[in-house]
Each structure stands twice: as structure tokens, then as C-alpha cells.
Amino acid sequence: MRKFLKYVATLLGVLVLGVLLAFGLAWFKTERALDKTYTVNDPPLTVLRDTETLAHGGHLFATRGCTDCHGADGAGKLVFDAGPVMRLVAPNLTPGGRLKDRTADQIAAAIRHGVKPDGHPLIFMPTQDFHEMGDADTAALIAYLQALPASANDPGPLEIRPLAKLMYLFDKFPLLPAEKLDHAPRARTPPPVGRTAAYGQYVAQGCIGCHGRNFAGQHVPGTPPSFPDARNLTPAALGGWQEADFFRALREGKRPDGSAIDPFMPWQAFAKMSDDEIA
């Protein structure tokens, strides 16, 4: 009996040591990654502030998922609190918030590269969705943000908690999207607006963060287990859908059989897209 208890105690000790070691490594990897800096030298943007540009920027803000995290007014909010994983907060993007002293190119670096003015990476910003955003679209979005009514709203701090760091250790959590991106300087010119595969691919970049880079679906990274999965969007799953079915899904939030799509999928934002953007 004494040998058995000694064996159990030893096993528990090894397990505890292993857990402590894993969390220690997770903490070290996270802190080292947060301390890394990136250089962004994309060609300077030309930001226009005419009525048409501001309207286009507002359209992008409303249809590219920005409002889901930052709010319709851009003043930021608590997105979710996932207990031991993280407290995800989207910052205030109005002139009264985080962007008030930033240049257009610094804002562009945050949007397309996930990089702060000091070169450090942004946490959990879905930059992969915006990395290929064209220069004119990016400039229009920035013009709109800079023209928003200033708000003093402070949604509080973002917190990276132990389980997020542990998942990040094993590359199971997209904590710092900047790590996965190519930061080589280049201009970005999107394909012409129209009902083409090239333009559809350009618009669909905004779906990567939830549905995955290959659009095959996944549990949305970082969200609590109770949140629904993002479904498979490839022909293997949606091969029977017609164009009208896609329009109904994105405009009405309904599947071909009439059942409702979970509101976690932000179809209300996509409903504001133009016919060309959906087609």
C-alpha cells in the first residue's frame, strides 16, 4: 500500500511539474512574441475626404465586419469574455480614442499588417481578413474612421489569460496574426468591381478569420466552446446552392430550406453589400 501511495504521489508530482512547465513555456513564448517588432513600409496612402470617399469608407466599415467588434459607432466594446482564455476588447476607433494621434499610414499598418506604430503586434486583430485590402479601399476606410464623431468610450483592457497562452504555445490560437503575414512593402490594387471570380476572391478575404484560409470551416478561433462553428463554404458543402441561395443567406439570414442562420454569422452586415459584392 505504501509503495502504491508513493507511486501515486510521484505520478501526481510529475503531472503538476509538467503542467507548470507547460504554462511557464507558454508564458515565455507569449511574452517573447509580444516583444517582437515588425517593420511596415508600404507605399504612403493618398487619403481623400470627399463625400464619395467617405460614403465608400462607411460602406466598408459596415460590411467588412468592423462593426461586429468595434460597434456601429466605432467606439469599441467588450466582444466576449471567455473565462480562462481571454477577455476580448475591441478598442475605440473614433478620433477620441486610440487613433486620434495616428497617421493614415500607421492606421493602415494596423488594419493590413496587425502592427502598432511602435512595431509591436496587435493582439487578435483579424488582420488576415484585411491584408490584401486595396490601397484605395484602405484609404477610404481610414478617412471614414477619422471623420467619425469623437467618443471618449473606454471598453477596458484586453486580457490574455493562461489558457490562451497555453493554446498559443501549441499553435492552436491565432493570438498575433502579424506573425503569419508577409510584411514586404507593396502597393495593393484590387480587381475591378464586378461579378467575376477575381473580385469575389477579393471580397471573400473578409471571411478567412472565421471560416479559415481554405474556407472549409472551423470553430472560430478564440471563441468559447458554446459559440457555433463557422461552416464549410467550399463546393463540397455548398455545391448545390444557387446564386439566389447565397443572396438569401446574406440578405435575409436564411438557408435554402428556409431555416434561420445563427445570428453569430454577421449576415446583417453582409446584407448591406452590393449585388456585385455578393455575386
Model-derived regions: residue spans:
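C-terminal capping alpha-helices of c-type cytochrome domains
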Residues: 18, 23, 104-110, 116, ...
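The canonical Cys-X-X-Cys-His
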Residues: 57, 63-72, 107, 141, ...
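Electrostatic cytochrome c docking/interface patches
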Residues: 37-62, 101, 172-204
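Extended surface/linker regions that mediate inter-domain or inter-protein docking
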Residues: 13-27, 133-197
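Detector for the c-type heme attachment site
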Residues: 69-75, 112-113, 126, 146-147, ...
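Gly/Gly-Pro-rich "capping" loops immediately C-terminal to redox-active cysteine motifs
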Residues: 40-48, 73-106, 121-134, 162-171, ...
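N-terminal type II signal-anchor transmembrane helix
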Residues: 2-37
